[in-house]
Amino acid sequence: MADPDVLTEVPAALKRLAKYVIRGFYGIEHALALDILIRNSCVKEEDMLELLKFDRKQLRSVLNNLKGDKFIKCRMRVETAADGKTTRHNYYFINYRTLVNVVKYKLDHMRRRIETDERDSTNRASFKCPVCSSTFTDLEANQLFDPMTGTFRCTFCHTEVEEDESAMPKKDARTLLARFNEQIEPIYALLRETEDVNLAYEILEPEPTEIPALKQSKDHAATTAGAASLAGGHHREAWATKGPSYEDLYTQNVVINMDDQEDLHRASLEGKSAKERPIWLRESTVQGAYGSEDMKEGGIDMDAFQEREEGHAGPDDNEEVMRALLIHEKKTSSAMAGSVGAAAPVTAANGSDSESETSESDDDSPPRPAAVAVHKREEDEEEDDEFEEVADDPIVMVAGRPFSYSEVSQRPELVAQMTPEEKEAYIAMGQRMFEDLFE
């Protein structure tokens, strides 16, 4: 059977006491937070955030301040959501028994502090010497008193001392204590009224409660969301397939059909026009190399050469080098013949040499298209012969006399003896040799 003296509801006096204290000694944020806890016995932190519209950091600072002063208590509970996730929530409530004790303690501490200040700042006489500025208390009055003159004199300079007005208290401590008692009287009255109140355990340690205002707003929001979902159901169905799908994330379907590749390639080639031959196949990109005119002068058929190039899309590298060397040799021989014709006739020995070179050049003329497929060994031998021929030192005419090019290069006085035509031929030959060297 329950004790008739135990109260199952919080008395109005305790609620007024909490409101008076929180509004008298704390800020407006603390008062708002405590008002919610007065109206609702145990409130979750998230619900307080929803009601007060505070920032979470600001609300926690306010609650931690009240909790540090023992006005409120905190209880942590672990809750399991519908999806199985566990979350921790803080619930705050007021323990009114602790609240009353804390208020009594703080008021008593304030009263003792005021009484201490009153006792320390009692109107005690203090003396100061106007000459040496020495100060004396009322306990030193027997040393300052001069019985001959009946005055208080300084013990150092024997000058009559004066009462120190700066040491007088600014306010009367007894007046301050009376004002404190007058202002705190309503709180004292509430404390006397709640002196013998005995609260039940479920009031001192309440269970979490649902706030009606928040419950109504949540129900209204749920109803609105349900109506919106019913109204836009077909829209969600249309977007149902737009969500992320991870079933076929690592599935790749590759189909390889080798039969149709040749037909597709042939059809693509038929649809495209024939590409124009690049300039590096039609003409030489090296300055001084053979061109169409040189090829005609050298007895090379341009059409036959192009047919051979088209017939062999990928000629051998050795064959290309050989043809280039043959044509360069042809040009060198023609230049040498021109220089000899411009100067005096050469000796019979030199003539025999030029004839042998001409015959060798004729023997080494570019092969006909029918002779392209000769044996690899024969091509290597011909290439070696060509390199040996190119390595021969050309002949330069100096005042009608033949000299080797290397000899003229080492003897500058021979260049001074040349005629203008011989000097021009000498310079042209040097340029061709330089171009042949870097090709």
Curated annotation (Swiss-Prot):
Query: Known PROSITE patterns for this protein?
Result: HTH_TFE_IIE
Q: Where is the HTH TFE/IIEalpha-type domain?
A: 14-104
Question: Could you confirm whether the keyword Zinc-finger appears in this record?
Answer: yes
Localization (cell): Nucleus
Q: Where are the transmembrane segments?
A: none
Its primary localisation, in coarse terms, equals nucleus
At which residues is N-acetylalanine found? A2
Q: Which UniProt keywords apply?
A: Acetylation, Host-virus interaction, Metal-binding, Nucleus, Phosphoprotein, Transcription, Transcription regulation, Zinc, Zinc-finger
Indicate the secretion signal residues.
none
Instruction: Extract the GO molecular function terms from the UniProt entry.
Output: RNA polymerase II general transcription initiation factor activity; zinc ion binding
Q: What Pfam family does this protein match (any one)?
A: TFIIE-A_C
- Point to the regions of Low complexity compositional bias: 333-344
Provide the residue positions that the database annotates as binding Zn(2+). C129, C132, C154, C157
Functional note: Recruits TFIIH to the initiation complex and stimulates the RNA polymerase II C-terminal domain kinase and DNA-dependent ATPase activities of TFIIH. Both TFIIH and TFIIE are required for promoter clearance by RNA polymerase.
The Swiss-Prot or TrEMBL record describes its family as follows: Belongs to the TFIIE alpha subunit family.
Q: What is this protein called?
A: General transcription factor IIE subunit 1
Question: What is this protein's gene name?
Answer: GTF2E1
